[in-house]
Amino acid sequence: MEIYQLSATELAKKIKSKEVSSKELTQMYIDRIEEFDGDINSVVVRMFDKAIQDAEKADIALSKGEDLGPLHGIPMTIKESYAIEDQKTTWGNEAFKENTAKSDGLAVRRFREAGAHFMGKTNVPLDLADFQSFNSIYGTTNNPWNLERIPGGSSGGSAAALAAGFTGLEAGSDIGGSIRNPAHFCGVYGHKPTHGIIPQTGHELISNVPDSDLSVCGPLARSAEDLKCALDIMAGPAEREATGWKLQLPKPNFKSLKELKVAVWATDEVAPVSNEIEERTTQVGETLAKLGAEVSFDARPNFDPTFAHANYQLLLQSVMAAGMGDEERAKIQKMVEELDESKMTSDAAVLGDKTALFEAASARGAVLSHANWLKANYQREKLKIAWKEFFEEWDILLCPQMAVTAFEH
């Protein structure tokens, strides 16, 4: 295996054992970006000179016996939406083309405090709101495995850079699949953590207090071990909340696969997937069963997935429409008032009118009153309870992230 294919935790061990220097590793990644990223277009903000300087500092610290942290000397990139001091943060939006961060965001600071340094930032779609990664400022990012196909979005540049061997570690954000679908399309690891575990401070265009509802920050990497390492670094309360709570995540409650109880949800009539995706998901479940895990292909959480998705759409669109202008909001309000209520029930969706239900939920969410938001939030809490009850019995729910593999631009 080539060194650029190794995980960040493996690379950190090599740096600390002096098998490779941080400067050598950083230069290797820079050389690969300069040679291959012209076709992929993943690393769109470049800080190569600063990265070499930071790598040299890491090597000097190591020579003095200093340990900078679990990522000592690791060069990395990060999603363009994160603030890095003196670098542009645009979210792919022309209106913010000249927006320059005055300081590092919290996640960036925490990665630096763990010993990492940054070579640049990776591409996103406009306003982080697409399953591909194109914007008019930086252009289109391609999938490293097939340049004709998308890398996913909105953390598409992050996943593409990892898959291409341009970086040791990445971080993205996710409100509707923005970490998960790029990881799926590019064949890397991604983790969308529970909301509230990782502060969003420094992942915004305009300072936003409190954190956005539903949206989360999280890592992308080349291994599950890297995800754990990065989560441990990123997680924990922001400074303003640190006196009120502390993070205490549960430790794994098993030591071998034979102790695991795994539920497999390979497809569903509400969200059918391709035969290939269903077969691969099923194969993983069958393999786990052969290795001794207790596996069920029938176990499900106790709620209606059609209703759950419609409720999610209400809450999602209420977040996405927060900055909507009065004129546009009035148009959507009129459309909502003209909806055919008989087609907007969960029963109607099950009978075949799913699209109408989801479109109606999206429109309603954009103009949701506070009273109706509270009702939707109440339903969300009931769903949380259903999930908690499910995971009291099952350790893992294995299901597809997307219905298909990466599709063409």
Task: Give the residues covered by each predicted segment.
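Short helix-loop capping/hinge segments that flank enzyme active sites or metal/cofactor-binding pockets
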Residues: 71-91, 256-265, 317-388, 404, ...
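Short glycine/serine-rich loop segments
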Residues: 103-234
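Conserved small-residue hinge/capping positions at short loops/turns
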Residues: 67-90, 117-119, 123, 129, ...
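Acyltransferase
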Residues: 22-26, 56, 273-301, 326-337, ...
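An N-terminal boundary/leader segment
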Residues: 1-54, 290-292, 362, 366-367
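A short helix-breaking turn/cap at a secondary-structure junction
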Residues: 192-285
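DPxDG-like acidic metal-binding loop motif
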Residues: 85-98, 164
